[in-house]
Amino acid sequence: MNVLVGTVTSTPCVAVANETAADNMFQLTPSGSATECVANPNVFRVCFSDPNQGTAAAQYIGEHKLATKVAIIYDSSDVYSSGITQNFTAEAANQGIEIVSSEAFTADNNKDFSVQLQKAKDGGAELVFLPIYYTEASLILAQAD
């Protein structure tokens, strides 16, 4: 039996899933959380899926009354970020959380977040939700005032 243990993130997991299916190879991802990761019957994941993470984050914010006005900054070119954002937005409505801005960036435009941050500020955001990786998150935090 051939086995692929990996990939670590969603985008490469989705990219190789059809190849492992064609090769009749068992694929296990420890942290590929996009729903598309397990679209083929040969692929399994160990972690929570993006829908679970987005829903749980909105529930936590709502149940603990952390904010009623939330801005979202996400990477629309990444299945992980987009998947979490979609489910967070849906559950936020159920929790009575107003999304005051939902601003995207892409992998080729991920250095200057002044526009997204200004829209969050103008919308009166009490919390900014960042379903993204640490590189961009650190830039956003450094640019926020």
Task: Set out the residue ranges of the language-model regions.
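Periplasmic-binding protein-like
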Residues: 1-8, 28-30, 69-74, 124-134, ...
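Extracellular/periplasmic bilobed ligand-binding domains
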Residues: 20-23, 84-145
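Short, conserved catalytic or adaptor-binding loops enriched in Gly and charged residues
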Residues: 35-38, 93
